[in-house]
Amino acid sequence: MPEGNKIDLSGDGGVLKEILKEGTGTETPHSGCTVSLHYTGRLVDGTEFDSSLSRNEPFEFSLGKGNVIKAFDMGVATMKLGERCFLTCAPNYAYGAAGSPPAIPPDATLIFELEMLGWKGEDLSPNQDGSIDRTILEASDKKRTPSDGAFVKAHISGSFEGRVFEDRDVEFDYGEGKAIGIIDGVEIALEKMNVGETSRIKIQAKYAFGAKGNEEFKIPPNATVEYTVKLVDCGKGLEEWKLSDEERLAEAKVYKEKGTNYFKKENWALAIKMYTKCKNILPTTVHTNEEVKKIKVATHSNIALCHQKSNDHFEAKQECNEVLALDKNNVKALYRRGQCNLTINELEDALEDFQKVIQLEPGNKAAANQVIICKQKLKESKNKEKKLYANMFTKLAANDKETEPPRETDVLSKCGEWSEEDAKREAELTLERDNIIMI
C-alpha cells in the first residue's frame, strides 16, 4: 500500500499519486491518445478486485474522453513511458456512492497500481484510419482554434527519417494552405490545435506528398512524414449565419475573385474550393435576383472548367448540368458538356450538345468541327459492332458445321453453305432489325 511521498493531482486530496518507478523521457500522453497500461485495483483492505495482469492483456483506452473513472484520466495523463505508480482514488473520483457491485462496495476508496506501457497519438484523420497522428508536445489553455477562412500564423518543421526538409514560419487563411505549400495533414491538424500549442504530427502519404513524393524535398513516393507544428496565432472565421443577404452577396464576390486568381495560377483544387464557397454563401431568399443567378451560372461554369483541366470529366459534366438548369441555352455549358460527353464516349449525347450549339450559334466553327468528329466516331463504333456480329455468326456457323453428321456427297453439297460475306450481310440485317444502327 502507498506510504511514500504523494502528489495531490486533484487539489482536494481526492486523487493521490505515488511514483514507484520513474519513467523515461519528458513526454506524457494527452487527451485523445490511445493509452496502453497494466493495472491492479484493490480496496483499502488489500482485496484485489481487478487486474489486467491476471488476464495477461494490457488495458487500452482513449485518454480524456470519459471512458474510465475520473481518477484514471487524471493520473494516467501525468505518467511517463515505463513509469509505475500507486493511484489512490476517493469515491467521488471512482465509482461514487453506488459503487460497482459486487466487486466494489458503495463509497469505496480504491488503490490502483499502474504501469505505463505506451501510447499512440490522437487520430485526427477524417476517416479515423490513423493517417494523421498527433502528439501534443506543449499544451495550451487558450481555447482558440482556427476555423475556415480564419487567418493563421504558425511555425512548421517537416522531417523524413530524421532529416529536416523544411523549417519556416507561415501565414495564410485557413483552408488555403495549399497556396503556400502546406500539406493537407498539417492543415487538418491545425484545426484541432489551440493557440500556443506545439504538436508532433505523423502524416501518411495520402495527406502528405502522395504517390508522387516531392523531388525538391527528396521525399520518395508513398512516404510517411513528421511535422512539428506550433500554432502561434489565429483569427476568427466568418460567421455566415450572422450575415445579411447583402453581406452574403459581397462575400460571394470575394470568393469568386479568389477562385479566379487561383485559376490563373492553375491551382485547380483551390480554385474549385473558392468557387464552391462562392455559390454556397450566396443568399437563398432572393432566387429571382438576376445578379445572384448570374454569379451562380459563372461559378458553376468555372468549376466545370477547373474539373476539365483536372481531367475529371464526370464532375465537369455535372457542373455543366447545373448551369443549364439555370440557363438552358448557355452556349458555353452546352459546348463544354459536349466535350465531356465526347471524352467519356457518350457519343450520341455529345452530338446532341454540339448540334444544339449550332442551332443557337449557326456560325460556331468549333462546334461544327466537333459534330464531324462525333459522326466519325459513331460511324467507327457502328463498324465495330458490325464486325462483332459478323464474327459471332461465323463462329456459330463453324460450330454447326463441326457438329453436323456426315452426309453423302451430292451435286448440291455447296448449296446454302455459309460464307464470310453471308455472315457480314446477316450481321447488317440483325443490326437493322434490332434498331441499333448508330448514325
From Swiss-Prot:
Q: Which reaction does it catalyse?
A: [protein]-peptidylproline (omega=180) = [protein]-peptidylproline (omega=0)
Quote the tissue specificity entry. Answer: Expression in the embryo is limited to three tissues: lymph glands, Garland cells and oenocyte cells.
For biological process, the GO terms are: chaperone-mediated protein folding; detection of light stimulus involved in visual perception; regulation of calcium ion transport
- Residue ranges of the TPR repeats are 252-285, 297-330, 331-364
A GO-annotated cellular component: inaD signaling complex
| UniProt keywords, alphabetically | Isomerase, Repeat, Rotamase, Sensory transduction, TPR repeat, Vision
Q: What is its EC number?
A: 5.2.1.8
User: What broad class of enzyme is this?
Assistant: isomerase
Q: State if Isomerase is listed as a keyword.
A: yes
Q: Which SMART domains match?
A: TPR
Q: State the Gene Ontology terms under molecular function.
A: FK506 binding; peptidyl-prolyl cis-trans isomerase activity
Assembly and partners are described as: Interacts with inaD and trpl, and may be part of the inaD signaling complex.
Purpose of the protein: May have a role in phototransduction; inhibits or prevents Ca(2+) induced stimulation of the trpl ion channel.
Cross-referenced PANTHER family: PEPTIDYLPROLYL ISOMERASE
This chain belongs to which protein, by name? FK506-binding protein 59
Q: What organism does the record attribute this protein to?
A: Drosophila melanogaster (Fruit fly)
